[in-house]
Amino acid sequence: MAKKMLFLFVLLLSLTGMLKAQVTTAGMSGKVVADEEAVIGATVVAVHEPSGTSYGTVTNIDGRFSLQGMRSGGPYKVTVSYVGYQTAIYTGIQLQLGETYSLNVTLHEASELLGEITITASKSKFSAEKTGATTNISSEQLTTLPSINRSISDFTRISPYASGNSFGGRDGRSNTFTVDGANLNNNFGLSSGLPGGGNPISLDAIDEVQVVIAPYDVRQANFIGAGINAITKSGTNAYRGSAYMYFNNEVMRGNKIGDTDFGVRAEESKTVYGATFGGPIIKDKLFFFANVEYEKSPQQVITWRAAKEGETPNNSTISRTTEADLAEFSQILKDKYRYNTGSFTDFPADVTNLKLLGRIDWNINQGNKLSVRYNFTNNKTWEAPNGSSGNTGYRLAYNRVSAYSMSYANSCYSLQNIVNSATAELNSRFSSNVSNQLLFTYSDMKDERGTNSSPFPFIDIMAGYYENGNQILEPYMTAGYELFTYNNLVKNTVMTIVDNFTYYLGAHKLTAGISYERQKAGNSYMRNGTGYYRYSSFEDFKNGAAPESFALAYGYNGNTKPSADVKFGQLGVYLQDEWNIRDNFKLTAGIRMDNLSFLNDIMRNQAIYDLDFNGMHIDTGAWPDSKLQFSPRVGFTWDVFNDKTLKVRGGSGFFTGRIPLVFFTNMPTNSGMIQNLVSITTRYKDGVVTSRDPRLELLKGNMITDVNQMISTLGLPTSISPEEGVLPSSVVGIDPDFKMPQVWKTSLALDYQLPVSFPLTVTLEGMFSKDINAVRQYNYNVQAPDKDTWSRFNGPDDRYIYPENFLQHTNISSANVLTNTSKGWGWTGNITVMAEPAKNVNIMAAYTHTESKEISGMPGSDANSAWTNVPSINGPNSSGLMRSQYVTPNRVVASINWRVHLNKKTSSNFSLFYSGYSSSGYSFMYSNDMNGNGVTNDLIYIPKTKDEIKFTSTEDADAFWKFVNQDPYLKK
């Protein structure tokens, strides 16, 4: 039945197009009356005065009007006219992104002396008809509030629910961030920052930002933390431009906290250059806006240098590696293999960031407005070669660039963050009762490693041998294509198409919408992808001796750049009714249905599938089944006295979000079916060889530099099938019934404008959330504690002791499966005060208390780390509710802005922002594996009395109780 209803709904909406659901515009609605009766057919025209953009309609049978798809900001001039009545003109109206401005109009009969009346809009904070927890950050605030990092988070912190990238105690990766409706989110989730190095778009190109925590508008979706919607600036009828420069260095920041001085500061600086320009192409009709910004931070990636002839190495800047050896090594590689190592004295270093943006706005006619925007970001940093890691059984004793070893410029690597994004939006009004929004967006985001090196094996030269002939396990020289850089790429492409169709029926505003989002994400990681050689000494290398170790990663079936990919499409269908039950009471009710389907095939590893976990199997060749998830929502706003001085608002509803896509690609990455990892090595004990892989002898003589020749020489497999799969050391899977995270949020708020001589408003808001489908990892390979056969500790701490055979299968270490839990809840309470005690002086202060409980915060980006890093008593599989790792229990924010007009054309702003908070939760854990389950995440037992636990000495007991008594929580 549900499928039939969905089909009919999709069929109905297919007449209007398709769309996704993050807001890009504002709106205006109201009622026109005269002599306490509704005025039918009154003309309402709103003009965005800076651009001359006009929006018009007429009132319906109930005297109501609604204008949608309007530019946010202003000022607007609204004219309301009707034959036989004075024309009412409202000026100075400002619209907020994503909100509908409420304008109720009373017309009076015309007289010969007065043909029209002009009214200047008051600065009520409650003119918008929002229902849930929302914060709007205006263009003025973006210009005046202090910003050190020039990042979006410098402004979203204004939201009382914010704590860095986290909102309401949720993982920052559960947010969604859009610009003009385009997804510029941290979808993959390897790090906590946004694409483009954390700032995918210049602040000087942004016009307004909206932060929504619990919006009861069903058009907003794909988050359980916060939805952050930004819109870019547009051109107007006036040519306006700006040029700017920002500079800071180590002298311009503090270096002392309390009594702690951090000593001499290393040199650092950052300079940002930028410009904006916009204006009319055709007055009142066609506009443009452009922005360019370039950032540069001089860096010194490598501070070590090689020792000159006769020079003594030191522990600060001069390495023991000599210039003569580096020069000889480089020349050999050039002469014998035609490989250029790059300089060993001049290394790439600078951090650069380039941002470009262009936007066109076209007022086709009064009923159709089109906007098109494109932006590009390229952030680039340089790093020294990896310190000491390898894939041959042990790490090097010291870093590859250090007092003991040196490398070359072409062995450094860059981290490059590239963003390309485009949007096209058409807002149409077909009649006074019918309007439509059609939006198309495209975003391509890449985080990739780069290098100046040509493809070539990575080579470690070790320091040789001791006098007794034992190997010195220390690096001496390094050259080649950095071992973790080849085909190291995270890519994410997002395309959305959305359509919102709105029909006005009396006191009802009906919205039907459909959205489709198609995402592709891939994680490519091939350490040793060009081959890896490690030689015991420089002499061994020069003499063509067999390498001490060798490693290689290559793709099966001729794929030179394999990737663990996930592709999915999400169809969203929604219906909403905004019902003005009375002039001062509006009820919003809607339902949203989202269906996510995976679109790419992956190969099963039959060896993994054959493992039996108490009747359950892990299929690494199948994505979760398609799931239809429902998100019903209801919200209301009540203007108690019908004068916008006291509003009560709130609502309740379901919100469906996403998880970092890396937790999906973890499965194919760890299945062993994408690429082959080969390690051929020599093993030691105390420097003495204990074993040596005989295949190393095949690599004597000149190095093999071609990957295909390496594969053929060593007789490695070039293809794979499900039946040829072998068991990896750890297994990663996804529950076939897995659902995207879903939470139920309920909020209630009161907005009050105090009756004083200046604007002074107070907001009280509370919100409760309950997890419907939270996310966790569950290790299938760990047996559940058995109260009948497992032992326990004696005493008050009677946790289980894991037996030696607690693993289901001893030939794998873990089998972590991504699954759901319904456990988890949270609540927040907030009070916000806003005031304008004097002209051009604005003050804001807010206090928020947050509590949030969860089973797992899914820390990191790896399935195993997400499981092992959950504090527990009887093991991560048995973990209970705990305070969220992302929660900030108490937070105070305040800001003050004072604008001083120096003359008619010049003014100065003085702004101050304050943020104070109590630290987030932490846990006390034993340093060892207390219960024997192989994981060092065991919570300590806090005794109630001094007699409950024993100590080996009186000194230990005194130290323990001294520590307990100084902590307010522990001593309870």
Task: Name every feature range the model reports, one short phrase each.
Residues L714-I720, S907-K972:
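Extracytoplasmic gating/loop element in the C-terminal half of outer-membrane beta-barrel translocons
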Residues N60, Q86, T91-N104, G115-S234, ...:
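Periplasmic N-terminal accessory/gating domains of Gram-negative outer-membrane beta-barrel systems
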Residues A121, A243-N249, A290-Y294, V372-F376, ...:
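Transmembrane beta-barrel strands of outer-membrane/channel proteins
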Residues L19-S124:
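Periplasm-facing N-terminal accessory domains of Gram-negative outer-membrane beta-barrel systems
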Residues I602-S631, F636-V817:
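Solvent-exposed loop/turn elements at secondary-structure boundaries
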Residues L203-Q210, V218-G227, K233-A327, D350-L356, ...:
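Outer-membrane beta-barrel translocator/receptor signature
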Residues T763-S919:
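Gram-negative outer-membrane beta-barrel transporters
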